[in-house]
């Protein structure tokens, strides 16, 4: 495969960058096996939770292990089109089992290991999983979930690291399986065949099933080649649980280009010191982390570390506050390149290495897609006006854009209208074509006739030295309809008090329009988050609504 990432500026990238999608494509055979022909080419560097033990795998290793895994699955009856629920952490088995499923044409359903029994029950039932692959640490949850459902479609249960009643020992099956898998031995996959199913975060309703097709990895050439700026020699670390979509953002395009992945099998609470130590000493040249990770990293003594080998930093998942970008750049000498996309897409908007970065902006639309900001009548908005981020999808789905929400015609009808996919996210475009994120449509705060985006208020609050993390939502108010309320996690060394509340409120008033300041502030030990690390503003909104509407009616906020 040939890719052209040589653009020196944004306009050149718009002209030159294209993705060719063949009629037939199989990520396992067309990417992994072809890369395996390059002797000794590094694919994966894995380290354990403590950063003590490490293993390195070449593309040839991944090829042979995935062949064994595919043959083991074939022997158990797994075939093209079967849905395979995979709940494994950041372990090597995840990668070669994933590739094995792709070689067979099975449809994977990745799942985070932190799922509850109820979550697992919902996903196995709704997704009609034909097989489950997990490990000893998680199989009891699966057993409990399966007991609660009638699942005649579930034919196989595999344990990756041992045996248990009712479970097949997958490691043993692999030992007996051949490392040879001719392409002709399995059914051919078209680029349009089902590939994987992700479940959305489900912060306001039950998770939707997002279906991607077999060409999806090629779409991530935008993510890896343009936004991550990857070259074949690079080693990239994308901080992500294997069960959510940012893991795909750090795998498919990267391996297609031929870069290596650095994987830290992190467990438990995030360890900022260990992360910085691994980042600066284990060879990663490109780093991508969610905003939550960067917010926690800047609380450490960043000056203690040498960042010279890490040439490129990126962030996505939710907006990153400009203050965090500023602190990071001052301490490391490197700027963070923000990007934007969804479970349903590849990167859509980004700050790319071939253009200037505007802190606080998501960047510009990714070359190769037709992206615009539209109003509710599907007309392009003027500069500075807020609208919905939309992707042109009139003839067929662009490569990398999801096929549909499975079994959800209402959501499909709402998302795809007049030849556009509406992301549901709001933004505005400045005079240079840079997009600034405002929020989900239902995140917008309507106070006394003003429309306030939570992110702009959060960014100002984040500049206060007492604030480690914060979230802003609408709180019902009898006078104004809604008021701005901030939930704040304090930085180490600060104590909650009425005086601190007033200080933060005055701080915000001095730095933005007075009507945007948080009339109410509540301190929390931690913010509610989705499995992917995004702040659950919907949970905070609902809590406020129930508190003010459910007990004694509405009250008036601070005047």
Per-segment meaning from a language model:
Residues 40-42, 159, 164-165, 175-199, ...:
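Conserved pre-ATP/AMP-binding loop-to-beta segment of ANL
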Residues 55-60, 187-188, 195-219:
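Conserved AMP-binding A3 loop
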Residues 174, 198, 256, 284-289, ...:
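Gly/Ser/Thr-rich phosphate-binding loop
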Residues 368, 379-414, 452:
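Conserved ATP/PPi-binding loop(s) of AMP-dependent carboxylate-activating enzymes
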Residues 218-235, 242-285, 300:
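Conserved AMP-binding/adenylation subdomain of ANL enzymes
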Residues 115, 125, 132-134, 280, ...:
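AMP-binding/adenylate-forming catalytic core of the ANL superfamily
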């Amino acid at each position: 495969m040939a890719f052209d990432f040589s653009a020196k500026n944004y306009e050149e990238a718009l002209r030159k960058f294209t993705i060719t999608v063949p009629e037939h494509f199989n990520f396992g055979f067309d990417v992994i096996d072809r890369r395996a022909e390059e002797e000794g080419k590094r694919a994966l560097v894995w380290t354990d939770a403590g950063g003590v033990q490490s293993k390195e795998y070449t593309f040839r290793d991944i090829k042979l292990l995935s062949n064994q895994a595919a043959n083991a699955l074939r022997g158990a009856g797994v075939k093209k089109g079967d849905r395979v629920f995979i709940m494994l952490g950041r372990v090597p088995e995840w990668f070669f089992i994933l590739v094995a499923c792709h070689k067979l044409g099975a449809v994977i359903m990745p799942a985070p290991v932190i799922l509850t029994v109820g979550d697992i029950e919902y996903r196995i039932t709704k997704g009609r999983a034909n097989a489950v692959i997990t490990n000893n640490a998680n199989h009891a949850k699966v057993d409990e979930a399966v007991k609660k459902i009638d699942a005649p479609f579930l034919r196989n249960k595999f344990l990756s690291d041992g045996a248990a009643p009712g479970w097949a020992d997958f490691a043993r099956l692999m030992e007996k399986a051949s490392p040879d898998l001719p392409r002709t031995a399995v059914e051919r996959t078209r680029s349009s065949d089902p590939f994987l199913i992700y479940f959305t975060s489900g912060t306001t309703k039950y998770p939707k099933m997002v279906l991607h097709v077999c060409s999806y990895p090629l779409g991530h050439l935008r993510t890896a080649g343009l936004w991550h700026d990857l070259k074949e020699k690079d080693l990239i670390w994308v901080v992500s649980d294997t069960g959510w979509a940012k893991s795909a953002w750090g795998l498919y395009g990267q391996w297609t280009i031929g870069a290596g992945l650095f994987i830290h099998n992190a467990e438990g609470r995030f360890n900022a010191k260990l992360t910085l130590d691994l980042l600066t000493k284990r060879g990663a040249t490109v780093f991508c982390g969610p905003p939550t990770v960067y917010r926690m990293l800047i609380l450490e003594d960043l000056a203690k570390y040498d960042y010279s080998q890490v040439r490129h930093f990126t962030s996505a998942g939710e907006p990153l506050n400009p203050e965090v970008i500023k602190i990071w750049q001052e301490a490391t000498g490197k700027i963070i390149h923000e990007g934007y996309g969804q479970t349903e897409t590849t990167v859509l908007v980004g700050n790319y290495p071939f253009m200037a970065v505007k802190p606080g902006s998501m960047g510009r639309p990714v070359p190769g897609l037709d992206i615009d900001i539209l109003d509710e009548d599907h007309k392009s908005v003027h500069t500075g006006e807020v609208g919905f981020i939309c992707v042109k999808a009139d003839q067929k789905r662009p490569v990398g854009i999801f096929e549909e929400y499975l079994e959800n015609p209402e959501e499909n009808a709402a998302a795809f209208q007049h030849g556009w996919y509406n992301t549901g996210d709001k933004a505005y475009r400045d005079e240079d074509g840079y997009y600034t994120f405002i929020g989900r449509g239902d995140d917008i705060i309507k106070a006394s006739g003003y429309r306030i985006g939570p992110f702009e208020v959060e960014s100002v609050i984040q500049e206060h030295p007492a604030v480690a993390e914060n979230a802003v939502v609408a709180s019902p108010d009898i006078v104004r309809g809604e008021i701005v309320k901030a939930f704040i996690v304090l930085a180490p060394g600060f104590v909650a008090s009425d005086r601190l509340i007033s200080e933060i409120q005055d701080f915000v008033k001095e730095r933005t329009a007075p009507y945007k300041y948080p009339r109410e502030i509540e301190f929390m030990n931690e913010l509610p988050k989705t499995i992917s690390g995004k702040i659950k503003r919907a949970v905070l909104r609902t809590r406020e609504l129930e508190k003010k509407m459910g007990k004694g009616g509405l009250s008036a906020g601070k005047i």
